[in-house]
């Protein structure tokens, strides 16, 4: 999985560096140094199927990704972390895209709390989509 991290503050950049060190090949970009609009950057990440880690507010992440969200089978996984690294939230494509697992991995690396909200996970029940993914089966939306 290719991971792209975007930050908006100095503290966010410091946290992104911790994450980047734990995940080989991760691209880290500061919003103010992008060289293109945030919308164009986000479009590019979705086109390349990169996982997106936003260090900042969930509201910013939602506004960034809204025009590009399509369906659970093709969306890029999106994870949000607050700049203090306290909470790591899979926002989009939790099961099929791997955002839940990525959030847990990131939280483990930075000492944060993964905030997993998918019903099958919080209720510890069987997940058809995770089963299909693990078995290499296809799901049609």
Which residues does each PLM region occupy?
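N-terminal loops that bind phosphate or other acidic moieties
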Residues: 3, 7, 77, 87, ...
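N-terminal basic/disordered segments at the start of proteins
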Residues: 1-28
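A short, well-structured beta->alpha microelement
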Residues: 26-44, 139
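Short, structured active-site "lid" loops
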Residues: 41-61
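Short glycine/serine/threonine-rich phosphate/pyrophosphate-binding segments
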Residues: 12-15, 60-64, 99
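General beta-strand structural signal in soluble alpha/beta enzymes
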Residues: 27-32, 53-56, 80-81, 114-118
């Amino acid at each position: 999985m290719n991971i792209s991290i975007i930050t908006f503050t100095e503290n966010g950049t410091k946290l992104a560096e911790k994450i980047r060190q734990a995940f080989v090949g991760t691209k880290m970009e500061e919003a103010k140094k992008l060289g293109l609009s945030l919308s164009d950057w986000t479009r590019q990440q979705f086109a390349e199927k990169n996982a997106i880690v936003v260090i900042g507010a969930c509201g910013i992440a939602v506004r960034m990704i809204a025009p590009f969200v399509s369906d659970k089978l093709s969306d890029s996984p999106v994870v949000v972390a607050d700049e203090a690294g306290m909470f790591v939230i899979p926002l989009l494509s939790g099961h099929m895209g791997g955002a839940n697992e990525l959030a847990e991995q990131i939280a483990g690396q930075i000492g944060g709390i993964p905030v997993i909200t998918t019903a099958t996970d919080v209720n510890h029940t069987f997940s058809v989509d995770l089963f299909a993914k693990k078995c290499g089966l296809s799901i049609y939306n």
